[in-house]
From Swiss-Prot:
The keyword Nucleus applies. Disruption phenotype: Homozygous mutant larvae show arrested development at the first instar stage as they fail to increase in size or develop into the second instar larval stage and die 2-3 days after hatching, without morphological defect. Mutant larvae show an overall reduction of most intermediate and mature rRNA as a consequence of abnormal pre-rRNA processing. Mutants show defects in rRNA processing and aberrant pre-rRNA species. An abnormal cleavage in the 3'-end of the pre-rRNA occurs within the presumptive 28S rRNA but it does not lead to accumulation of a truncated 28S rRNA. Residues 232-245, 331-345 have a biased composition (Basic residues). This is KRR1 small subunit processome component homolog. It comes from the Eukaryota. Belongs to the KRR1 family. It comes from Drosophila melanogaster (Fruit fly). GO terms for cellular component: nucleolus; nucleoplasm; ribonucleoprotein complex; small-subunit processome.
Amino acid sequence: MSESEAEETKISTEPVDNAWSMKIPAFRQEDNPHGMVEESSFATLFPKYRERYLKEVWPLVEQCLAEHHLKAELDLMEGSMVVKTSRKTWDPYIIIKARDMIKLMARSVPFEQAKRVLQDDIGCDIIKIGNLVHKKEKFVKRRQRLIGPNGATLKSIELLTDCYVLVQGNTVSALGPYKGLQQVRDIVLETMNNVHPIYNIKALMIKRELMKDPRLANEDWSRFLPKFKNKNISKRKQPKVKKQKKEYTPFPPSQPESKVDKQLASGEYFLNQEQKQAKRNQERTEKQKEAAKRQDERRNKDFVPPTEESAASSRKKEDGSSSSKVDVKALKAKLIKANKKARSS
């Protein structure tokens, strides 16, 4: 190993501000000269409609995996793909990458794109969206939002995240750098939760422009990003008069008094039938007297003479209003006009 390579492989213990800027150290054959001790294998099933395509490209798949000392098998009877390590395999993680490649190919990703996952700085993410929305109509509508008219929305997501994105059935397959995969997952999940992807696309476009300015590298970008308010108003009708909740008490409410309890409290319970009847008659006559008294007061209200003080005060008001209403000048002009008529006659 040369001095320059030794300097590159030195492990830094200093704090890192941006983890995405760190370079992933390369894993070479010299790092694992003895190879793998045990054989590892992964298998995945594929649908019937992918059988013809996989049969055509399988020689290319075997050739690609042979470069990494891996074996590949295609079982058309069972409908499965298998990848295995060999005695010459020296990279312990390449079998995981090969497993991801055959998973992507089973999800209708073309071989030219799927083989990119074997690179160190490229990863993949298969996002399951089938169980995020309960109604099928809503699911189809929101999934179509991801694609957009003529695939425009999907193309813009690919350009902004540097990822290959494929919407297929109940899954969204993404392939690209790890930071881009994180952004794709956020956009997909928010879209299925009824947030239009154009909002996240706008935010990514603004972030891309801000990254070009070195002065804003250590600043908070939230003030530049658009803030969208939810305009979906609840369709539930609110009551005009809302009942206020009573204060919580750990004790149960007191038991309401029964008729017998009320009779015991008033002493009526111990009376015989005749005494009870007499008491009821007495209460009835008292109520009738009160009602007759109120009726007489209402009838005699119009015949009650006003008090002297009120009569005097009303007279003063009338005098004041009449004196204030008299116009002296108009009265004088009227008298002069009457005198002129008398003289002329």
